Amino acid sequence: MTGSEEKVRFLVGERVYLRPIEKEDLADVRRWANDPEIRQLTGEVTPMSQAGADEFLERVRTDKERVWFVVVVKEGDRVIGEAGLLRIFWPWRTTDLSIIIGDKEAWGQGYGSEAIRLLMDYAFGYLNMHRVSLGVVGFNRRALRFYEKVGFKQEGVQRDGYYHDHAYHDFVMMSILEDEFRAMQQGEGMGS
């Protein structure tokens, strides 16, 4: 890529944008996937090798039930995370959401809230989804508060559904429906 070429900004917000993941992003994705703190907080159990990163990229490029992006801060075009929709089940108009802000310096800056708004607007507005769901490791209180702030509601707990550090932990299931998302957009501004 030459200096004059610009990457496609797919979903654009005020401070961040989402763009399709590219091969050059895999070093960051792999670093985050192998970070012990991030793995603990997200429930990821398998380290990512270079071959695994290449397989991941191929999967997100070809899987019709998945869309995947990197989260980029507009100022400086700095990649800070990844986000996507997976297990899209078109007949029921449902999908699961995943987001990781892997750059720890970007934690607590509101980038995740903006990125998730962009992704949910895409899911509900463009893909015509009815329901977006996710799972959260029960001891990750910060993530639970974050998802509640952006409109997700707890709908159940998989008791002892996650094993980490020689102990079982709960896994909290959450979701947001299209009408709830639209009401938040019109009302309180999705936690902004």
Locate predicted features.
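Acetyl-CoA-dependent GNAT
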Residues: 46-106, 177-180, 189-191
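Conserved catalytic-core motifs of GNAT/GCN5-like acyltransferases
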Residues: 133-136, 153-170
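Conserved GNAT acetyl-CoA-binding A-motif
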Residues: 125-135
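Conserved acetyl-CoA-binding loop-helix of GNAT-fold acetyltransferases
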Residues: 108-122, 141-149
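A short, well-structured alpha-helix characteristic of acyl/acetyltransferase catalytic modules
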Residues: 1-55, 180-192
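Conserved active-site tyrosine of GNAT-family acetyltransferases
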Residues: 147, 152, 174
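Amphipathic alpha-helical recognition patches that constitute DNA-binding helices
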Residues: 28, 96, 114, 131, ...
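Conserved G/P- and acidic residue-centered "switch" motifs that form tight phosphate/ATP-binding loops
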Residues: 25, 77, 110, 140
